[in-house]
Amino acid sequence: MYEPTLTVESFDSELAGAIRDERRRQEHHVELIASENYVSPRVLELQGSVLTNKYAEGYPGRRYYGGCEFVDIAEQLAIDRAKELFGADYANVQPHSGSQANAEAYMALMNPGDTLLAMDLSHGGHLTHGSPVSFSGKFYKAVHYGLNAHGDIDYEQAAQLAQEHKPKVILAGFSAFSGIVDWQRFREIADSVNAYFMTDIAHVAGLVAAGVYPSPVQIADVTTTTTHKTLRGPRAGLILAKANPELEKRLNSAVFPGSQGGPLMHIIAAKAVAFKEAMQPEFKTYAQQILKNAKAMAEVMKERGYTIVSGGTQNHLFLVSLLDKNISGKEAEAALGRANITVNKNTVPGETRSPFVTSGLRIGTPAITTRGFKEKEASQLAHWVCDILDDIHNEKVIADVKQKADELCGKFPVYQELD
């Protein structure tokens, strides 16, 4: 029996201290990592709910354990809301992460050794899109397309590689591309070689749900996503598809029992409430502001002489290439971090440094938009980033920006209602 009155603070002060410090960091640091966001108190509450106690292998109405009548309600709500939100005919809400959702979709669509055509990691793809260090590059033969000289996806290269390699799956999706993907063009390329067309919208799912970024859900055979990032839900995954009963069976089997056991019911409940939040009119306003803030920041950095990959942004993120500066992405990330501005180093097209050093920065606006930043604050922030990058070893500049960033964060608290 455990002592129910002991708090984490009184029982485990070391862990409580780390959480307290992380809470403080989130309040006092400007978050510009494109894949991060701040969930609502409702999502936080459900992730700590009693649903974490329930084992529920299987699917609603078809469980291997008894006592699932109430978690069935939670999961069915999540399924129905996901389908409605994204205009999908099928949804599986059990994947534990976006990477796992991709692995499960691959399992349903390919056999080991089959060919996958996807975007190159250094041009904006993702580790799970066939990188040799990932399961996706170890279990499948990966071929990669990239960006053209204009910074757009090279569809002609993708079509040529499709004809040459006859992939089983053609994947469109990205982790660091600031443009709009022509989903229909990829559909046509896939059809030309009788391949499955799969999309990974992990980064833009919230924008797609809000209708401010084109949806691939009824164009692709299968769509995967995370449920955090722009969607602002718990850290987890989701698989969507248009109507195809045979494929739906294979997807369900790939998730359970193919690669997962018991689903995380507390996380699935948090997904359900996040999907409901994304259906509200204010979520579209939020998504529109994400785009405005990203464009404002990218424009300032261009004016200040920094190279924006693809020339600008049409979504929530943009890549800053530092190839023409005497700065590495690692140095830039560290200097900005000392000013309480959190970004991540990122590889860029034409990369000359290792993935642990890089020649670029990825900047995203979902989290600052959740705080309430608008174009004015986003533009100020971009100037501060440039001030540091212009004189990266000047600790006085860094200290001045840190003070201004802290003052700005104080005006836009993240979790004031939890204090």
Swiss-Prot record:
Which family does the similarity line name? Belongs to the SHMT family.
Q: Which residues carry this modification: N6-(pyridoxal phosphate)lysine?
A: 229
Q: Where, subcellularly, is it found?
A: Cytoplasm
Which keywords does the record carry?
Amino-acid biosynthesis, Cytoplasm, One-carbon metabolism, Pyridoxal phosphate, Transferase
Q: Could you identify this protein by its name?
A: Serine hydroxymethyltransferase
Q: What is its main location?
A: cytoplasm
GO cellular component terms, semicolon-separated: cytosol
The residues listed in the UniProt record as binding (6S)-5,6,7,8-tetrahydrofolate, with positions renumbered to this chain, are: 121, 125-127, 354-356
Task: Tell me the name of the encoding gene.
Answer: glyA
Write out the pathway annotation from the protein's UniProt entry.
One-carbon metabolism; tetrahydrofolate interconversion; Amino-acid biosynthesis; glycine biosynthesis; glycine from L-serine: step 1/1
Q: How does it assemble?
A: Homodimer.
User: Which cofactors, by name?
Assistant: pyridoxal 5'-phosphate
Q: Which NCBIfam families match?
A: PRK00011.1
The record's section on Pfam families has: SHMT
A Gene Ontology biological process annotation? Answer: tetrahydrofolate interconversion
**Catalysed reactions listed for this entry:** (6R)-5,10-methylene-5,6,7,8-tetrahydrofolate + glycine + H2O = (6S)-5,6,7,8-tetrahydrofolate + L-serine
- The record places the site described as Plays an important role in substrate specificity at 228
Q: Which InterPro entries match?
A: PyrdxlP-dep_Trfase, PyrdxlP-dep_Trfase_major, PyrdxlP-dep_Trfase_small, Ser_HO-MeTrfase, Ser_HO-MeTrfase-like, Ser_HO-MeTrfase_PLP_BS, SHMT-like_dom
Amino-acid biosynthesis: is it a keyword of this entry?
Answer: yes
Q: What is its EC number?
A: 2.1.2.1
Q: Name one GO molecular function term.
A: pyridoxal phosphate binding
The answer to keyword Cell division applying to this record is no
What does the record give as the function of this protein? Catalyzes the reversible interconversion of serine and glycine with tetrahydrofolate (THF) serving as the one-carbon carrier. This reaction serves as the major source of one-carbon groups required for the biosynthesis of purines, thymidylate, methionine, and other important biomolecules. Also exhibits THF-independent aldolase activity toward beta-hydroxyamino acids, producing glycine and aldehydes, via a retro-aldol mechanism.
User: What organism, scientifically named, is this protein from?
Assistant: Coxiella burnetii (strain CbuK_Q154) (Coxiella burnetii (strain Q154))
Tell me where on the tree of life, at the top rank, the source sits: Bacteria
